[in-house]
Amino acid sequence: VDTTQLLKGVLDLAVLAVLRAEDGYGYDIMRRLRAAGLEEIGDASVYGTLRRLFNAGLLTTYVVPSEEGPHRKYYALNAAGRDQLDRSGKVWRAFASTMDSLLDDRGVAA
């Protein structure tokens, strides 16, 4: 099953959720998403999502010097980002619950 369209619909929420636990730079965020099970996530999708969330006022950034190469731009949730995560998380949970019910009622195995 091609999950590309599903990922597009939930990538903002996934990035916000990853940043709830800890600030991160682009590659680190992508690595954490993949480790959580979103292996198909592309680099461009993650970086584009970070830019979009920042431009929407949901993230702040800061630069940290790195001894292993160029400085790293870290992303962090701000108050608006936490509010958006809470709202989107509630919508997602309700949607997922509805889909679970539909699949269970039709005898579709989990």
Model-derived features with residue positions:
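N-terminal helix-turn-helix DNA-binding core of bacterial DNA-binding proteins
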Residues: 3-47
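Alpha-helix C-terminal capping/helix-coil junction sites
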Residues: 34, 54-55
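Amphipathic alpha-helical dimerization/coiled-coil segments
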Residues: 83-110
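Short beta-strand/turn micro-motifs at beta-sheet edges
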Residues: 1-5, 63-64
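Beta-hairpin "wing" of winged helix-turn-helix
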Residues: 56-70, 76
